[in-house]
Swiss-Prot record:
Gene3D superfamilies: Pseudouridine synthase (3.30.2350.10), PUA domain (2.30.130.10). Its EC number is 5.4.99.25. GO terms for molecular function: RNA binding; tRNA pseudouridine(55) synthase activity. This is tRNA pseudouridine synthase B. It comes from Mannheimia succiniciproducens (strain KCTC 0769BP / MBEL55E). It catalyses: uridine(55) in tRNA = pseudouridine(55) in tRNA.
Length: 305
């Protein structure tokens, strides 16, 4: 007779992990899910094993809103090593080209405006983007180069921090879909010396505060203590994933209607557009709705708590 499968917990919220170097985002996700004994978990955009920093992990009903964090702005601190290009554009790859570094701080400062604003970027071959149903990195590992189209990205900030040749430290605030490895590789080519990522740390996702992150060691200590209550207290609310959306408070009657997936008409939505967060009269988060024509809202992602 097969042993009955142990049921996990219906736990809901967003956990902020300070991801350690050397672990994949998917490995981290499965370990966090196991530690929380959660029925459902999902991360909000992978970090390379080399990278450290903020990795929001959605548990339970929060997974319905993970796409909002995938689409959110990100901030990074990156150390680029000038003079070397690698096949992965980071320190984990093989060096494919070495050049002398005759780059001054002023030359770097003069180059940065070229990469700010709305630009086009060709994704790295070592990425999870798919071609004919297979991730690009699988082609890359087989020595196959696939033609990739340049994609629009936005670099909101690209700030110089320090330069001690051959190491250049920058801070980046960017849109979704930005590959920092590609940005560094492109910058190295623009400077004429080549470059790759030596260190990468994600410092922010959306508006999540860095002081709410837990280190891997702290998480393991909670797990060893079997203190689920303390772990649960570290979770941020489900609606934190959509905190940038405007709030729309509903009446009791409207709350019941959206609970059944029905559209609700308002007299005046005060020029609200796009998507809104819905709350009940008791200030309970209900989900996200789309604002349509004639002041009608349509429930799109509703929580089931």
């Amino acid at each position: 007779m097969s042993r009955p499968r142990k049921r996990g917990r219906d736990i809901h919220g967003v956990f902020l992990l300070d991801k350690p170097q050397g672990m994949s985002s998917n490995d981290i996700l499965q370990k966090v899910k196991r530690i929380y004994q959660a029925n459902k978990a999902g991360h909000t955009g992978a970090l390379d094993p080399l990278a450290t920093g903020m990795l929001p992990i959605c548990l339970g009903e929060a997974t319905k809103f993970s796409q909002f964090l995938l689409d959110a702005d990100k901030r990074y601190q990156v150390i680029a090593k000038l003079g070397e290009r690698t096949d992965t554009s980071d320190a984990e790859g093989q060096v494919v080209e070495t050049r002398s570094v005759n780059v001054t701080e002023q030359k770097i400062l003069d180059s940065l405006p070229h990469f700010r604003g709305d630009i086009m970027q060709v994704p790295t071959m070592f990425s999870a983007l798919k071609h004919k149903g297979k991730p690009l990195y699988e082609y890359a590992r087989a020595g196959i180069v696939v033609e990739r189209e340049a994609r629009p990205i936005s670099i909101f900030e690209l700030n110089f921090i320090s330069y001690e040749a051959p190491y250049l430290t920058l801070e980046v605030h960017c849109s979704k879909g930005t590959y920092i490895r590609t940005l560094v590789d492109d910058l190295g080519e623009y400077l004429g010396c080549g470059a790759h990522v030596s260190m990468l740390r994600r410092t922010a996702v959306s508006d999540y505060p860095a002081d709410k992150m837990l280190t891997w060691e702290q998480l393991q200590q909670f797990a060893q203590d079997e203190d689920l209550a303390a772990l649960d207290a570290r979770l941020l609310p489900v609606d934190s994933a959509v905190s940038k959306l405007p709030v729309l408070s509903l009446s009791e009657e409207q709350t019941k209607a959206v609970g059944f997936g029905q559209r609700v008409k308002f007299d005046n939505l005060q020029q609200l557009q796009g998507q809104v967060r819905l709350f009940s009269p008791q200030n309970v988060f209900l989900g996200v709705a789309e604002i349509g024509k004639d002041n009608v809202i349509r429930p799109s992602r509703m929580v089931n708590l």
